[in-house]
Amino acid sequence: MKGKGEVSLNHLKLKAASLLISAALLAGCGLTDEKITMKPETGESIQVTLDRGDDFSMEASSGVLVVYQKKKVMMRCAFISREQEQAQRASIITMPFEIHREEENYISYSMGGPDGMVNYYMYPVGKKTWLYAATHLPPEAAEKVLSRIHFKEGSE
């Protein structure tokens, strides 16, 4: 006859084993990062990696990368040359705009559009390629979306 302490110990071992199995199964269900390789007109290959947590996803069509959360468009991203980036910077001064942050290789600004305020982001993601992203999200929310997207030049 087994004592009360032995039954409890075996019972605890079974519970611990089932918890470990459950944790391992749940870990296998986790979302992995999504990757897309963009090939802009600059000639570079830019690997884009998205953290898919919180129901984020992305797709590429006609050279534009669209980032979604729960199937709602969060941001549109194009890949442009340094010359196009400089032309875009020069053109914004001809319209009402507000700069949120400007550095040598980074700018974020807002402009009114037909569908309301649009926030733009431009910064290099390769040796010859710049990200040109647009969103209707406020700057703080847009920064959170951008923090989920990672770029690596030259990857296939």
Where do the protein language model's features map onto the residues?
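Bacterial N-terminal signal peptides that target proteins for export
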Residues: 6-17
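Surface-exposed amphipathic alpha-helical segments
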Residues: 48-56, 132-156
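Secretory pathway targeting signatures of secreted, lumenal, and periplasmic proteins
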Residues: 42-91, 110
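Bacterial signal peptide processing site
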Residues: 30-32
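Short, surface-exposed beta-strand/loop "edge" segments at domain boundaries and coil↔beta transitions
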Residues: 72-78, 85-86, 114-120, 129-132, ...
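Signature of long, low-cysteine stretches enriched in small and polar/charged residues
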Residues: 92-137
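C-terminal motif of bacterial Sec signal peptides marking the signal peptidase cleavage site
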Residues: 26-28
